Amino acid sequence: RQLNPSSQELQSPQQSYLQQPYPQNPYL
């Protein structure tokens, strides 16, 4: 999540999901 800009997180939350563990992802 921290590696991607917030705009990209909104566009493709799956990327942040792949980059960081599931429990640590605030979007999930």
UniProtKB/Swiss-Prot annotation:
Annotated tissue distribution: Developing endosperm.
Cysteine pairings via disulfide bonds: none
Region (Disordered): 1-28
Sample GO molecular function, one term: nutrient reservoir activity
Keyword Transferase: no
Keyword tags: Seed storage protein, Storage protein
Biological function: Sulfur-poor seed storage protein.
Name this polypeptide is given: C-hordein
